[in-house]
């Protein structure tokens, strides 16, 4: 999958990118702002966006999710902002809570990929940090 990462914490963004690339995914980004995320989404064919909610300490990830939805790009919130994620569940496929186990990200993406393509998700266990909103 081609996955857009929108995360303003550099170490988290790099760790996330590394895990996904090692699993064979193409990483777009990471982007740390609304503008950078949307620019990358327009420049590349993105299959999925992983979005931190609290970009720049302002909740800008919700704005990114709204714009990506208009572009028909599915998003998953990756954040410690549980209440905000649930309040905006209509904008995302789901939520991966921080902190998370890095291996759970790869497994979560496999589950999300199956859901997006109408396939049977990989066998359990589904990562505890993943919550689907559908």
Model-derived regions, located:
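Conserved acidic carboxylate
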Residues: 7
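Acidic, metal-coordinating helix/loop segments flanking the phosphotransfer/catalytic sites
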Residues: 30-48
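A Lys-centered signature of the CheY-like receiver
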Residues: 98
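Conserved two-component signaling phosphotransfer/partner-docking surface
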Residues: 101-106
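CheY-like receiver
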Residues: 116-134
């Amino acid at each position: 999958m081609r996955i857009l990462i929108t995360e303003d914490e550099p170490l988290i963004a790099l760790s996330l990118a590394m895990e996904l690339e090692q699993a064979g995914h193409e990483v777009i980004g990471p982007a740390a702002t609304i503008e950078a995320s949307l620019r990358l989404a327009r420049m590349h064919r993105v299959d999925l966006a992983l979005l931190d909610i609290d970009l720049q300490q302002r909740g800008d990830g919700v704005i990114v999710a709204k714009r990506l939805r208009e572009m028909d790009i599915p998003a998953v919130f990756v954040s410690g902002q549980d209440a905000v994620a649930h309040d905006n569940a209509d904008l995302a496929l789901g939520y991966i809570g921080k902190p998370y186990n890095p291996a759970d990200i790869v497994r979560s993406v496999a589950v999300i990929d199956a859901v997006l393509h109408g396939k049977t998700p990989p066998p359990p266990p589904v990562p505890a940090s993943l919550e689907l909103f559908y």
